[in-house]
């Protein structure tokens, strides 16, 4: 782990795994309390997809980073990869679940059952002019900005395609599929980060400092993956 190659490949996966575990605990408690109404099926669906994909990616990348030892049965990577396959397909294909998540989200927003959380800062005017956006406060605002922006974009595109005569099925499967996947992921990752921030409130001292660093790494990795979106939308400086 002293090598930069290992750190850059494995530490973001570890940070995301820990963050997803906090998110899973939040969803489990919400399901038990049945306190979030319409959102419960969406939360259960999105945490299942996110943890399944993370499991598959972690197993694949970790096997590669172990080199030849990754082929040994004692390393158990074959077992992990087989289990990850189940995570991706059991109880509904993950990509199909993402469609359900967006359908429920857009329905809740349209019916006023749900209001998308707003960033605390003006993302384009303030965060978009900063040299360092790595604090949890700024990262949280960026996640919320991505969610609301994608939601606006997909609503506008769906309406335009409907006017062109496309059916709802054609719009979802042939016209806005990429946006649907991005929006569902943005919804899940925003919920994940919010649950991590809430969890930090229960910690103090060194525990809080360490876990804040973990959650920042997980969030920064998401922003790095979607950097093109943030630069295009002027939410981050080029």
Where are the predicted features?
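Flavin-dependent oxidoreductase catalytic core characteristic
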Residues: 1-238
């Amino acid at each position: 782990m002293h090598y930069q190659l290992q750190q850059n490949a494995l530490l973001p996966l570890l940070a995301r795994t820990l963050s997803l575990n906090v998110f899973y605990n939040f969803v489990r408690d919400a399901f038990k309390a049945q306190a979030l109404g319409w959102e419960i099926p969406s939360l259960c669906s999105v945490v299942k997809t996110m943890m399944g994909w993370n499991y598959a990616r972690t197993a694949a990348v970790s096997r590669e980073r172990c080199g030849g030892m990754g082929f040994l049965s004692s390393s158990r990577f074959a077992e992990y990869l087989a289990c990850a396959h189940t995570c991706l397909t059991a109880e509904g294909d993950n990509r199909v679940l993402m469609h359900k998540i967006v359908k429920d989200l857009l329905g809740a927003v349209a019916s006023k059952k749900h209001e998308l959380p707003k960033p605390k800062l003006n993302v384009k005017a303030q965060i978009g002019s900063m040299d360092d956006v790595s604090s949890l406060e700024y990262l949280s605002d960026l996640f919320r900005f991505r969610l609301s922006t994608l939601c606006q974009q997909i609503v506008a595109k769906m309406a335009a395609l409907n006017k062109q005569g496309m059916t709802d099925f054609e719009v979802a499967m042939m016209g806005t599929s990429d946006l649907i996947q991005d929006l569902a992921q943005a919804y899940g990752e925003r919920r994940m980060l919010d649950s991590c921030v809430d969890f930090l409130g229960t910690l103090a001292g060194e525990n809080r400092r360490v876990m804040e660093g973990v959650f920042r790494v997980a969030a920064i990795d998401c922003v790095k993956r979607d950097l093109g979106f943030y630069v295009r939308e002027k939410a981050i400086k080029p």
